[in-house]
């Protein structure tokens, strides 16, 4: 639902992957995981153990969530570091939010960490607010410290 790609001179500089509701997102994730897991175990993505540890950590340390009835849509956004600060993220988010409104979606949520200052500034500027936060050891093995996971929401009604 409402997936978008930003290009500059034929090169992808950003994208948004979104779901209008939780159930289709969960089904798509499960389908993809069923495809990827055997390949992961066979080493097609490199040594399997680090990937398995990551997946287990996702299950062990879930981030906070917002109510699905008020904020059924989810999004993941990424912008190439070289393109950040040039309006790419803002344009992607504006188009994504417009698409959700046109589909009658009442609200959207996303997850980030407190350490992601640039993204948090963008979300705030685009009308999102922090709904919930929780300290999480999820990132500790990768960054050497736990981080604060946050779920941000935006009403669209």
Please place each PLM-identified region on the residue numbering.
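A short helix-loop-beta-strand connector motif used in the catalytic cores of GNAT acetyltransferases and
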Residues: 1-5, 21-26
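Conserved GNAT acetyl-CoA-binding A-motif
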Residues: 71-73, 100-113
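Conserved acyl-donor/pantetheine-binding loop and adjacent beta-alpha core of acyl/acetyltransferases
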Residues: 22-76, 139-141
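Conserved acetyl-CoA-binding loop-helix of GNAT-fold acetyltransferases
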Residues: 76-79, 85-102, 121-125
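C-terminal "cap" of GNAT-fold acetyltransferases
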Residues: 71, 113-117, 126, 136-157
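Ligand-binding pocket scaffold of soluble enzyme catalytic domains
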Residues: 17-18, 73, 88
């Amino acid at each position: 639902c409402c997936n978008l790609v930003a290009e500059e001179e034929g090169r992808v500089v950003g994208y948004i992957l979104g779901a209008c509701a939780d159930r289709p997102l969960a089904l798509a994730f499960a389908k993809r995981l069923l495809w990827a897991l055997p390949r992961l175990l066979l080493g097609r993505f490199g040594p399997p153990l680090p990937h398995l540890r990551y997946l287990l950590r996702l299950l062990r340390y879930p981030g906070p969530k917002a109510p699905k009835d008020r904020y059924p849509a989810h999004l993941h956004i990424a912008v190439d570091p070289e393109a950040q600060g040039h309006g790419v993220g803002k344009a992607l988010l504006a188009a994504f939010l417009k698409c959700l409104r046109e589909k009658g979606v009442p609200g959207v949520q996303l997850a980030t960490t407190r350490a992601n200052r640039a993204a948090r500034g963008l979300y705030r500027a685009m009308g999102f607010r922090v709904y919930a936060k929780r300290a999480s050891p999820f990132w500790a093995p990768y960054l050497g410290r736990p981080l604060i996971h946050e779920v941000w929401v935006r009403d669209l009604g």
